[in-house]
């Protein structure tokens, strides 16, 4: 039986509700060799500085030794190397763990198995780090929820989610679904491996290592039980145990999530009980980023009424941010009816623009081919994500400002190489800049 057939079998067992057994035997030479060929050899190395190429020189011998240690219970992952990278959209740094290459093989194999076990169990609220799901699907689902009976939104943020996952509680969640002590023990050792901060060893008392091959799925398992199933239970209860009076929805992408509610009392109840629920499992809500707002088809009318009564000076309903976009209430141009629109978060767009302009300034003396290749690679990636329905003004302005910056800095190279706008536009015909046409219809997105 191939690995894919084994994983498919595991998925069927898991879907039936039976605890899955005999998983550790899949951490065999064949699986690890497949993981070896799948891993990117250009990634940073761990504390032992062994590269993929070096490990592969004696691949069979190395894998035989590794499998022997796994079977004998003597495999212990090395501490990861802690580095800090820029956190997208902010000025903050995000910790990242660099595992040794051999440990990356185990992490990747474990992740394959965990995905097979949990994909049949994960609920439809969850979109992050799952096969055949992405950010645009999460956004589309959220838009659909809001276009329904939503009148209130809970925008929430978990403070340092990945760093505060309780190891013992995570293991207990895994044991609900997996009846293989050896496999669970390997995961426990991965969690407890610690990391090096410079040359200083630090115990990992909580959290999953960001950068580990299994970390996203382990975090999804934790949030599945802490948030998703808990919310689903609240939403489905009827009769005397009914928790929500009206329609309620949830969309989660990794640790970012938004709750949508028909009634304010339900939104406030969810917010209040969420704090208690999270505290039980080691999570804390970032109060400055967590709030209940009125949002939906009646938000503008209700705001206008409060303004008429002199209760507020606001003219527009509150907005909220999710996955790089600002969501706001609007009216459809053709019908005048309520609709929800999205636009690029202003601060993030400006920060990205500043990065690109700084690159243009620094590299203005490079060959035009080099400049254009880099810019188009960056812009295509940016537009593939942000060029969605309704966001044409933001991405068009972004592109326009890049072109203006190009004109400015190419004219600073030398008098001999300077352009007027006519000459510059002629040059753009030979070296076109990626256009900002809409790539994704998020109102009718299908996976």
Residue ranges and their predicted role:
Residues 3-5, 59, 76-78:
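Extended, charge-enriched "interface" segments that sit outside catalytic cores
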